[in-house]
């Protein structure tokens, strides 16, 4: 059996003298002290929770969630890998993101464990779950469905997929033949009723000029080309309670004929004639229509209440069910003459950033750069009045 001898100190000794301890010094290369870094900018992406009380963002490849009203912030991930793509579940207590661990992008869910914890910034325990782990398939850019029961994502950078979070069953929405770039994903969005996706895609193999499409969320359906443009269109999102799709396009501004220097405009394509007719009303006619609709809704509520009998508890349950049903109104899609229901919103083309329409459909907000950096602009869609809301640069 072998043995080991460990020597702690070294000594020298001459004849007739006492042992002398040898002083040993080891010189090592300098290394910096551990530093605590504080950042107030540099986030690469961010998203707001459905209740508007939390903001999730990514800084230096890590996921953080902060309170919208206070400085309380919690770091969700602690990994050497990069994270990207953030999506809150409708319950505000689950966060989806992608992480490039072990050299492969995969989906993860972070969940607040304790029911007593109101949000992520104040949560004491946050659990992380790997969703559909795989060593060969890449999955990224997650987005929760409006009801929170499903999660959409982009697989292998080209295919739009959906997973049922209860059964873990995955279905294919697009087959990857309409997107050629493998440098990242593409923009897409759920419809408010959860039955459709709008997305940017390459139609007629006209890469890299993308169009705006509409496709069923059930899968096994072709993409409907809404724009049919020879120029770049992108950043689609649903607006006006899902009755229209807002997007950016370079068809009116300077075009990227030499692969640079293009300018964008914000546009709306209306999915049905009623939504388009409402948009085209003057401010006076629109106010009259709103009053008429309010009176009709009030009368309908009275008739419904008269026709229902039962206890207060039953009535309350029925009212809650009716409210939920009203909030999830199915979107009417009318393909005929859709090309005539497309309008340019912005008065002039620009180097444009993010674009969004207010929930009531009255105001357009967008970032645009004319001279220098981006500024925040506001446009009244009824009055066609545009003004600078905030000077950023």
Model-derived features: where do they sit?
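Multi-bladed beta-propeller domains
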Residues: 13-41, 67-84, 111-140, 163-186, ...
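Long hydrophobic segments that form regular secondary structure
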Residues: 49-56, 61-67, 191, 213, ...
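Edge strands and adjacent loops of beta-rich recognition modules
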Residues: 322-330, 335
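Structural motif
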Residues: 8-10, 64, 103-110, 159-162, ...
């Amino acid at each position: 059996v072998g043995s080991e001898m460990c020597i702690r100190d070294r000594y020298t000794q001459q004849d007739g003298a006492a042992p002398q301890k040898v002083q040993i010094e080891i010189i090592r290369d300098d290394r910096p002290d551990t530093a605590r870094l504080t950042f107030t900018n540099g986030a690469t992406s961010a998203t707001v929770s459905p209740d508007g009380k939390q903001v999730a963002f990514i800084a230096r490849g890590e996921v953080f969630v902060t309170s919208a009203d206070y400085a309380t912030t919690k770091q969700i991930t602690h990994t050497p890998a990069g994270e990207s793509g953030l999506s809150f579940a409708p319950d505000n207590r689950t966060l989806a993101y992608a992480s490039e661990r072990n050299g492969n992008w995969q989906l993860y869910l972070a969940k607040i464990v304790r029911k007593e914890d109101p949000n992520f910034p104040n949560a004491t325990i946050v659990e992380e779950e790997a969703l559909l782990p795989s060593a060969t398939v890449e999955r990224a850019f997650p987005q929760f469905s409006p009801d929170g029961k499903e999660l959409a994502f982009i697989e292998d950078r080209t295919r739009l997929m959906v997973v049922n979070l209860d059964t873990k069953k995955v279905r294919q929405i697009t087959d990857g033949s309409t997107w050629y770039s493998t440098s990242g994903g593409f923009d897409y969005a759920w419809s408010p009723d959860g039955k459709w996706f709008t997305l940017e895609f390459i139609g007629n193999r006209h890469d890299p000029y993308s169009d705006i499409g509409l496709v069923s969320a059930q899968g096994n359906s072709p993409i409907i080309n809404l724009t049919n443009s020879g120029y770049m269109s992108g950043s689609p999102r649903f607006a006006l309670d899902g009755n229209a799709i807002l997007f950016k396009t370079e068809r009116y501004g300077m075009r990227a004929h030499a692969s640079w220097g293009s300018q964008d405009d914000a546009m709306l394509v209306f999915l049905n004639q009623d939504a388009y007719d409402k948009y085209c009303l003057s401010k006076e006619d629109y106010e009259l229509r709103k009053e008429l609709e309010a009176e009709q809704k009030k009368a309908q509520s009275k008739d419904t209440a008269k026709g229902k009998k039962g206890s207060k508890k039953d009535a309350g349950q029925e009212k809650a069910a009716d409210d939920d049903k009203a909030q999830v109104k199915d979107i009417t899609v009318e393909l005929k003459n859709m090309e005539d229901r497309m309008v340019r919103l912005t008065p002039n083309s620009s180097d444009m950033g993010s674009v969004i329409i207010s929930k009531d459909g009255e105001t357009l907000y967008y970032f645009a750069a004319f001279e220098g950096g981006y500024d925040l602009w506001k446009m009244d869609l009824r009055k066609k009045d545009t003004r600078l809301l905030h000077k950023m640069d």
